[in-house]
């Protein structure tokens, strides 16, 4: 949670209110850990970044034109420690999602990001993700999300 506490003020300073006091919370990360879907990047003994690499697809993903019954690997809760931003941590975590997809026998990778998150909107296309559409999520009212997909 220390990483979230460092990242959230930076997100808010850029107008990105995707994360806040209520999300993500310790219970969310505890569930990720229990399901063996939380990935941690470590540099010099410090947590450099985290992501949840899952098969969880929100029902609203269908609004982006996706068949949510297809097996896909989905990245959620991607965060990079400010001390390690610009060092390829997010790229490495996204590449880990590709490894998980290959092991799971799927070639579909998906991710969504807040419409105000300019950093990830720049990152995902550089990694081969294609913009698929804009959605809203019932669990995050008042926010808009951009969906991206990559086929291996």
Where are these regions (language model features)?
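Conserved active-site alpha-helix within GNAT-family acetyltransferase domains
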Residues: 91, 103, 116-133
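Conserved GNAT acetyl-CoA-binding A-motif
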Residues: 94, 101-113
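A short helix-loop-beta-strand connector motif used in the catalytic cores of GNAT acetyltransferases and
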Residues: 28-40, 56-57, 74
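Conserved catalytic-core motifs of GNAT/GCN5-like acyltransferases
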Residues: 112-113, 125-145
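Conserved beta-hairpin
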Residues: 37-51
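Conserved GNAT-fold acetyl-CoA-binding loop/helix
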Residues: 8-31
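Conserved acetyl-CoA-binding loop-helix of GNAT-fold acetyltransferases
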Residues: 80, 86-99, 122-126
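Conserved acyl-donor/pantetheine-binding loop and adjacent beta-alpha core of acyl/acetyltransferases
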Residues: 52-77, 85, 139
């Amino acid at each position: 949670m220390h990483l979230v506490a460092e990242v959230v003020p930076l997100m808010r300073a850029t107008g990105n209110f995707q994360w806040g006091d209520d999300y993500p919370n310790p219970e969310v990360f505890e569930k990720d850990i229990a399901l063996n879907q939380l990935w941690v990047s470590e540099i010099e003994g410090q947590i450099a970044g985290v992501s949840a690499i899952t098969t969880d697809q929100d029902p609203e993903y269908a609004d982006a034109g996706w068949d949510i019954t297809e097996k896909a690997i989905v990245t959620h809760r991607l965060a990079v420690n400010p001390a390690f931003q610009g060092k390829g941590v997010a790229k490495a975590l996204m590449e880990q999602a590709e490894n998980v997809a290959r092991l799971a026998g799927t070639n579909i990778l998906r991710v969504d990001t807040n419409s105000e998150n300019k950093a990830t909107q720049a990152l995902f296309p550089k990694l081969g993700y294609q913009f698929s559409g804009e959605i809203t999520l019932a669990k995050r009212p008042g926010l808009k999300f951009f969906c991206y997909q990559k086929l291996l």
